[in-house]
A protein has these predicted regions:
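Surface-exposed beta-strand edges and flanking loops
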Residues: 75-77, 85, 139-143
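Hydrophobic transmembrane signal anchors and adjacent membrane-proximal interface regions, especially
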Residues: 4, 23, 39-42, 98, ...
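An exposed acidic His-Trp-rich patch
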Residues: 91-174
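Short, hydrophobic/aromatic-rich beta-strand segments within well-structured domains
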Residues: 82-84, 101
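Short beta-strand micro-motifs enriched in acidic
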Residues: 84-90
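N-terminal "first-domain core" detector
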Residues: 1-81
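Long, compositionally biased interface segments
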Residues: 168-226
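A general structural signal for short secondary-structure junctions and capping/turn motifs
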Residues: 62-65, 72-74, 90-92, 127-131
Length: 226
């Protein structure tokens, strides 16, 4: 499983680089097994792990991650993406935990409004759109019995903003392809540009649903499942 996730992330990174959408990146590597766990993470997670959850304001967290080079992908508009995956080191190497964050830049105009500013290599550091509200997103997966609690802490969930207890149920975990495709389609698609349609397809099979029957009866986010 870790090989498929690694392939998806590497292929997506090469795709984004080839189309000039990234200004910087850090490659995630498959770590050696430790305590029955094998991680797929970039080096910044091992050296000085960033604190992605807490009361730090979005703008401050974004500036800190950028200054420390603590991200996997940095888009031309300054938006960051971080990926952290943990797999079982035995058996089929199933996914145990994951945390994927999208942190839009708090300082620049959004890509959709004027893509030529970014694709034309213009200097846009002083361009600020006061009407755009930047909100971080985090896709989490954690199937540990001690953590999971129906509705309050779904196995797979989406957090919008920095609300500590915001956990919108997802139908299942999301591999790198699905999160990156969502980000491209939701935040970088314009009437003439549809990057997500050319993104290399998923390597992984749709996972088994983790959402409970009760969670399905309420507002939730659906991902492709087996």
């Amino acid at each position: 499983m870790i090989d498929l996730y690694s392939a998806e992330l590497n292929e997506a990174t090469r795709f984004l680089l080839a189309r000039g959408l990234l200004s910087s990146y850090n490659t995630a590597h498959k770590q050696n097994p430790r305590h029955g766990v094998r991680e797929l993470v970039a080096s910044y997670w091992r050296a000085d792990p960033p604190k992605m959850v807490g009361s730090v304001p979005h703008a401050e967290l974004h500036r800190e991650l950028t200054a420390r080079n603590s991200f996997d992908l940095r888009f031309l508009d300054g938006a960051l993406m971080t990926f952290k995956y943990e797999f079982s080191a035995s058996g089929k190497g199933q996914l145990r935990r994951s945390a994927v964050s999208f942190l839009p830049s708090p300082d620049l105009t959004v890509f959709q409004e004027d893509p030529e500013l970014y694709l034309g290599d213009a200097l846009f550091g002083d361009v600020v759109d006061e009407g755009a509200v930047t909100v971080p997103l985090r896709f989490d997966y954690d199937a540990r019995e001690a953590v999971v609690e129906e509705l309050r802490h779904p196995v797979s969930h989406l957090t919008i903003g920095s609300y500590k207890h915001c956990r919108i149920p997802l139908t299942c975990g999301a591999s790198p392809y699905y999160v990156i495709e969502f980000v491209l389609r939701a935040f970088y698609q314009t009437p003439t540009l549809a990057w997500s349609s050319d993104l290399p397809g998923p390597r992984t099979e749709p996972p088994v649903a983790t959402i409970s029957d009760l969670e399905r009866t309420l507002i939730h986010v659906a991902l492709p499942t087996a």
